[in-house]
Amino acid sequence: MARMVQCIKLGREAEGLDFPPLPGELGKKVYENVSKEAWQAWLRHQTMLINENRLNLADSRARQYLTQQLQNYFFGTGADMPAGFVPPSV
């Protein structure tokens, strides 16, 4: 049976992650509070941030920026959007 969590992003109970996605306390917090669906949405957002901001993940500042954005996305006021981003029309 799937592990269920009260997802902090979706605001409802949903299937939880299979394992902590990051090491340390942040990984544990994400594992306990974020659903698979919300994690997939974060991965899409993270990819957009990496591509649009041309982040080099070999640079520790880029990794720190993404970690801060992850914390904002799930536990804060929301992550940044790339400059000039226009959401696609549905």
UniProtKB/Swiss-Prot annotation:
Keyword Iron: yes
Biological processes annotated in GO: cellular response to oxidative stress
One Pfam family here: Iron_traffic
GO-annotated cellular components: cytosol
This protein's UniProt keywords: Iron
InterPro entries associated with the record: Fe_traffick_prot_YggX, Fe_traffick_prot_YggX_sf
Alphabetized GO MF terms: iron ion binding
Protein purpose: Could be a mediator in iron transactions between iron acquisition and iron-requiring processes, such as synthesis and/or repair of Fe-S clusters in biosynthetic enzymes.
Family: Belongs to the Fe(2+)-trafficking protein family.
Protein name listed in UniProt: Probable Fe(2+)-trafficking protein
